[in-house]
Amino acid sequence: MTQDKILILDFGSQVTQLIARRVREAHVYCELHSFDMPLDEIKAFNPKGIILSGGPNSVYESDYQADTGIFDLGIPILGICYGMQFMAHHLGGEVQPGNQREFGYAQVKTIDSELTRGIQDDTPNTLDVWMSHGDKVSKLPTGFTVIGDTPSCPIAMMENAEKQFYGIQFHPEVTHTKQGRALLNRFVLDICGAQPSWTMPNYIEEAVAKIREQVGSDEVILGLSGGVDSSVAAALIHRAIGDQLTCVFVDHGLLRLNEGKMVMDMFARNLGVKVIHVDAEGQFMEKLAGVTDPEKKRKIIGAEFIEVFDAEEKKLTNAKWLAQGTIYPDVIESAGAKTKKAHAIKSHHNVGGLPENMKLKLLEPLRDLFKDEVRELGVALGLPREMVYRHPFPGPGLGVRILGEVKKEYADLLRQADDIFIQELRNTTDENGTSWYDLTSQAFAVFLPVKSVGVMGDGRTYDYVVALRAVITSDFMTAHWAELPYSLLGRVSNRIINEVKGINRVVYDVSGKPPATIEWE
């Protein structure tokens, strides 16, 4: 099935990925590429329309220019913030620095136009939007009309109805812009005429066919971590090629309570996937002995994982492919790191990449999907919702939730405490019936290698401390500590102290990000 596609050219905005997510939510396939994508590649991509993202630069900086041949392709184009300024500048208009930066909430007064027709909510001819700009369009290009303004931005929206070119100075992709989703849907579905055929059933059908064509009769090996991405990748590949897939599950002794059993039950017993379970706890603990520096711990765990995985791979002499759970944000960030044009690049945990001596081809069946789409796919493939919608878990596991040196004793205590915390979050709901686990974005316990005095019964105790951490965030770049009910925190504390022998004090972390990070190490 041929998908209609939207192309997003990225000029470096912090929220460009949100544009892609909004388009995908309209069930239209889109891809995000660097602003300097060559024109012949754009033509080959054959988009139904193009969206030009925002960005931190000025249109007068020669390093941030797209090929102006896009304006001769005869397809609709929407410019957002910097994208609008780029459009105006190159089509004969003028852009000048604003007398004052406009940042935050604004109301745009609109007139009837192709772009705004039917998207206002309660107040006719008004859009509630989120602005973030300094420069602004001061003179329209020929053929354009103003379709929206604010007191400080007389040309907040513009259109050339004949050519279907549109410019908006605000960000429709962020949730603060009340009618933003409707505006993007109007552009993508109505103006571009893209068909909403990007659905999980369609994706599964296409992905299965693609994997079969790519792999043929070859065997595939996949490192199964128990995390969402590798689990969904395993389920999808197994749907496509069955016993040609072998998963390697490395238990380094730093997993959550009963996680190894859960993974084996789900994949080996329920789905019939071939899984090699490697118990490497002793090996990892030996390497981590005496190491207290967080970065050194991460590197040791990563290197040891590759070594264990590599040893298992060598036993599977018929394997020709290495499968990974790479997802679309990983692809975008890696591309940004290579071009040096992205403004915020983070590293991500995969199987550490391909070791140099590994002569395997790479299979990445999730590389076109955002995280929310991966979760949706997992449910569609029959994985339990509880597994698919679990909170993020760091690649090094409990190794970075035990402060200082990692010991088996510490990991065993932390596992039990963390499990109690998660149980209570799942079992406690707010007034709307939503569990506090679903209300929080990430929650976990942290082991502190310090002892404090306590009293239990008639005796004095001198045991360890755990800290509870729960945050609410939309993007994990910033986060607010979750204001959990005192009754919930009290229950968690009582259960941990009574049920986990060796812990006598529980504290709750009320630090936001920034200044603190979400993980303690």
Swiss-Prot record:
Gene3D superfamilies: 3.30.300.10, 3.40.50.880, HUPs
GO function term, MF aspect, one: ATP binding
CDD domains: GATase1_GMP_Synthase, GMP_synthase_C
Record's catalysed reaction(s): XMP + L-glutamine + ATP + H2O = GMP + L-glutamate + AMP + diphosphate + 2 H(+)
Entry superkingdom: Bacteria
Chain positions recorded as ATP binding sites: 225-231
Boundaries of every GMPS ATP-PPase domain copy: 198-390
One Pfam family from the record: GATase
GO cellular component, one term: cytosol
Pathway note: Purine metabolism; GMP biosynthesis; GMP from XMP (L-Gln route): step 1/1
Keywords on record: ATP-binding, Glutamine amidotransferase, GMP biosynthesis, Ligase, Nucleotide-binding, Purine biosynthesis
EC number(s) per entry: 6.3.5.2
Function: Catalyzes the synthesis of GMP from XMP.
HAMAP family hit by this protein: GMP_synthase (MF_00344)
Record PANTHER family: GMP SYNTHASE [GLUTAMINE-HYDROLYZING] (PTHR11922:SF2), GMP SYNTHASE-RELATED (PTHR11922)
Oligomer status and interactors: Homodimer.
Listed name of the protein: GMP synthase [glutamine-hydrolyzing]
